[in-house]
Structure formats: C-alpha cells, structure tokens
C-alpha cells in the first residue's frame, strides 16, 4: 500500500542550523582598517543573504547553534575595543569560530546549501578612524535579537511541517492497519472454505472407492448380470431411437395439417373476395347505366326548356328567319354521336325523340328554311373540335374519346356541336346573337347560355329574361349532376 506523503513536509527542505559565515582580510598592511570596517558593518545584510533553506533538527542542535552565535557576537564586540594587533588576532579567532560553526553536524547534509559571501566595503586608506562604541553596541544587539527571532520563526515553521508529516504518516499507518485486518479476515474465510472443500473432496473420493468395490464384487459374483444389463441398455437405446423417429413424423404431419388448414382458409378468403368483387362489378355497371340514363334524360329536358325559351324570344310578328341543319344524334361505337343539320320548313325547329337501343335517343332538330350565316363558338380550352363552315352549313368534327376508367357520361353538350346563330331582323332592329353552351366546366365543354343584343328597346328586355331563365336552368342541372356524381363516388 502506498503512503501518501505531503509535498510541503519535505524533510530535506528544513534546516535549523545557522548559515556559515566567510570572511577575510585584505592583507597584513590593512588589517586595522578592515577590522574597523568589520566592526562597523551592519549585521542585517550578511544575515539576510545567508538564510536560504532549513531542515529537520533537534533542540540540542538549536541550543548549540545559539551558544555559538552568542560567542561570535561577543568576540566581535571585544574585537572593537582591543588595539589593532589584538584585533587581528581576534579576527583570526573569529575566522576559526566561523569555520568551527560550519563544521557542525547538520541534518540536511544530503541537500546542497548555497554559501553567501560577505561583501566588505573597502574604505579609503585613512590612518585615523573614529569609532563610536555606543552605536556599534546597539546595532549588534538589534542584529542578534532579529537573528534570534528569525531562528525561532523558522523553528516553529519546521515543527509545524514536521507535525503535518507525522499526521500524514499516522493516517497512512492507520489505513495500512485497516487493510491488514481486512486481509486477515478474508484469509480466514478463505481458509475455512478450503477446509470445507477438502472435506467434501475426501468424502467424494471415499464414495468412489466404495462404488468401485461394490461394482467389482457384483461382477465377480454375478458375471451373467453384466450381459443382461448390456442387452437391456441396447434395447433401451433402440426404443429411444424409435420414439425419436415417431416424434419427428408426428411433427411433420402436424406441420402438413397446419399448412392444409392455412391453404383452405386462404382459398375460402380468395373465393369470398372474388365473389364480392364480381357483385361489386355488376352493381357498379348497373349504377353506371342508370346514371347514364338519368343524366341523358335530365339533359334532354333541360335542352328542351332552353329551346322553348329561345322560341318564346324569337316568336314575334317580325320573326327572324334562321337556317340550320337537321341534327341527328345516333349512337356510335365508344359512345359518341354524329350530328347532321338539315333545314326544315314552317320556321320552327321541332325535336323528335325516338328510343334507340342501349337507352339512347335520337334527336331531330328542324330549323327554318331560309339560310343565314351561322358560326360555331368553342371555348378557349377545347382543342379536339375543329368546325368547318361551308356556305352556311356547319359540321362538327368527331372528338377523341377520353381516357376514363369505368364509364363516361352519356352524350351531352360535348357531343353536340355548339352553335352560334346570328339572326338578321328587318331594318331598325339590331341583330341578336344567341350562344348555346353546355353546363360542364371541364375541358371541351362550354359553361353557359348567352343572348346578345345591341338594341335598347323592349326586345332587349325579352332577350335578357330568356338569358336569365336559361342560366338558371343550367345551374340547376349542374347542381343535380354534381350531387349524383358525388353519391356514385362515395358508393364506389
């Protein structure tokens, strides 16, 4: 187990011994002046330069260093009072004492201490030097007191650091003891388990030996029993193999039965789906046929109403003469119609409806005998119809069938050519243009019935009323047809 040491408690960084002093004379001739300079030099500078590092030390070494320091200070004071030759001798003694202090045993011998050098101020060679004993004594006393205080401070810090080190070591020792106790407990439990295992192994070995002995005795006394046991074992093996084969066969048959049931259920479901689809198809076809018949009937009724409104507008004393071709709506393949327009006498255009196969009807329109210029009007979106105007006769080109899925609305205005009839009236009356358009808004179909006139007399009012009636009829037809289409879409 690793001991966690505190970095601040490094023993090598603690030192209680005083720093080593070094000093020397400049020569034999200037020994007096150097001694005076040493005596008058303040003690704070060398002491501040020499204090660098401290290590662990005992109280005896501290007392010894203090006694040495006091002796050195007394030697310095006496040196200042003696004459120059004596001072020289005492100065030599001071050097010896400093050397002796440096040779004291230190606890921090491992760490390198830096030696501070005392810089002595070289005074000018003056034979007369006055010395003030009172100032020197006070300065030396202050220096010694400061040095002692610093020593005590460093000693207290070193003791504090040593206490921290001891605390950390104590905590590490406690942790080590705790770990040792836990390890001892674990080892005791492991030993108990090992003992139990050894006893169980011994019992197992004894049981094996007993079984071997019993088997050997049984084989020796009854040799026929071994053959019987072998035959019984072979029979048991055969029975187990037959049971396994039977089990596999049963599983295979069960899987086949499940597959047949699944196939039967799928076939029944497919039959149900096909029957429902067939019924839906027949029902949709019947609904489509009925819808075609209803739409065609409604459309023919609306067209008859529009024609009646136009007749009421045009039936005046000075009736205008119109020319149009007789139109027949004949069912053709793909549900389209052919339109033939031929003139009819009596100034009217009656409509004759005759039932035809597939619920269709044939419509004959007989306009007046006199032929006037007539023009076809097509909406902007229509691209399939291409009219041909030749000498007042109009023929509509057949349209291309739409790509519808199930059904197509019975022949309406998109199958009948849209006619624009310009009616010429006698003088003093402006021509009236009647535009008959379909009620469907999709491509290839017109949207309304428009009557145009240029007069401001009573004829304008009549034509306006006819126009409004025709528009109202077309709106109703549109609404009815939209409702029927929505109901068909929802039912499908």
From Swiss-Prot:
Q: Name one GO cellular component term.
A: nucleus
Motif Nuclear localization signal, residue numbers: 479-483
Q: What is this protein called?
A: Protein PAIR1
The alphabetical list of record keywords is: Coiled coil, Meiosis, Nucleus
**What species is given as this protein's source?**
Oryza sativa subsp. japonica
Disulfide pairs here are none
Q: Which residues form a coiled coil?
A: 166-186
Concerning PANTHER family, the annotation shows: RECOMBINATION INITIATION DEFECTS 3-RELATED
Predominant location of this chain? nucleus
Subunit-structure text: Interacts with CRC1.
The record's subcellular location field reads: Nucleus
> What is the purpose of this protein?
Involved in spore formation. Plays an essential role in the establishment of homologous chromosome pairing in early meiosis.
The record, for InterPro entries, names: PAIR1
Q: Name one GO biological process term.
A: chromosome organization involved in meiotic cell cycle
Q: Which domain of life is it from?
A: Eukaryota
Q: Which residues cross the membrane?
A: none
Q: In which tissues is it expressed?
A: Expressed in reproductive organs, but not in vegetative organs.
């Amino acid at each position: 187990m690793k001991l966690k040491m505190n970095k601040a408690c490094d023993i090598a960084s603690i030192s209680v011994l005083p720093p080593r002093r070094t000093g020397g004379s400049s020569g034999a001739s200037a020994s007096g002046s150097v001694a005076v300079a040493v005596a008058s030099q303040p003690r704070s500078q060398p002491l501040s330069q020499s204090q660098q590092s401290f290590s662990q030390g005992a109280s005896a070494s501290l007392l010894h260093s203090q006694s040495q320091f006091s002796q050195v200070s007394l030697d310095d004071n006496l040196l200042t009072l003696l004459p120059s030759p004596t001072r020289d001798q005492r100065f030599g003694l001071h050097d010896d004492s400093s050397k002796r202090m440096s040779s004291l045993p230190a606890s921090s011998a491992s760490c390198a201490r830096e030696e501070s050098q005392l810089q002595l101020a070289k005074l000018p060679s003056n034979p007369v030097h006055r010395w003030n004993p009172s100032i020197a004594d006070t300065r030396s006393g202050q220096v010694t007191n400061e040095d002692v205080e610093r020593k005590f401070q460093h000693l207290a810090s070193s003791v504090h650091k040593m206490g921290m080190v001891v605390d950390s070591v104590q905590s590490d020792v406690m942790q080590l003891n705790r770990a040792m106790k836990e390890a001892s407990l674990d080892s005791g439990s492991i030993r108990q388990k090992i003992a139990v295992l050894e006893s169980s192994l011994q019992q197992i070995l004894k049981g094996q030996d007993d079984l071997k002995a019993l088997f050997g005795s049984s084989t020796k006394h009854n040799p026929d029993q071994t053959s019987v046991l072998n035959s019984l074992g072979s029979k048991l093996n055969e029975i187990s193999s037959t049971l396994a084969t039977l089990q596999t066969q049963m599983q295979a048959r069960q899987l086949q039965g499940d597959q047949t049931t699944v196939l039967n259920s799928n076939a029944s479901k497919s039959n149900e789906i096909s029957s429902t689809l067939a019924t839906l198809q027949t029902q949709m076809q019947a609904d489509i046929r009925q819808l075609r018949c209803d739409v065609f009937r409604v459309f023919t009724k609306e067209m008859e109403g529009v024609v009646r409104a136009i007749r009421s507008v045009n039936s005046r004393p000075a009736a205008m003469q119109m020319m149009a071709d007789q139109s027949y709506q004949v069912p053709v393949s793909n549900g389209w119609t052919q339109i033939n327009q031929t003139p009819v006498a009596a100034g009217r255009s009656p409509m004759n409806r005759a039932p035809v196969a597939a619920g269709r009807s044939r419509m004959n329109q007989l306009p007046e005998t006199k032929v006037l210029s007539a023009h076809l009007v097509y909406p902007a979106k229509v691209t399939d119809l291409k009219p041909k105007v030749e000498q007042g006769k109009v023929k509509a080109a057949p349209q291309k069938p739409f790509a519808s899925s199930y059904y197509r609305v019975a022949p309406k205005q998109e199958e009948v050519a849209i006619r624009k009839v310009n009616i010429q009236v006698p003088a003093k009356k402006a021509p009236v243009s009647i535009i008959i358009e379909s009620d469907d808004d999709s491509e290839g179909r017109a949207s309304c019935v428009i009557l145009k006139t240029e007069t401001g007399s009573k004829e304008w009012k009549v034509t306006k009323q006819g126009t409004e009636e025709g528009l109202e009829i077309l709106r109703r037809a549109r609404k009815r047809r939209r409702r029927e289409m929505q109901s068909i879409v929802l039912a499908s």
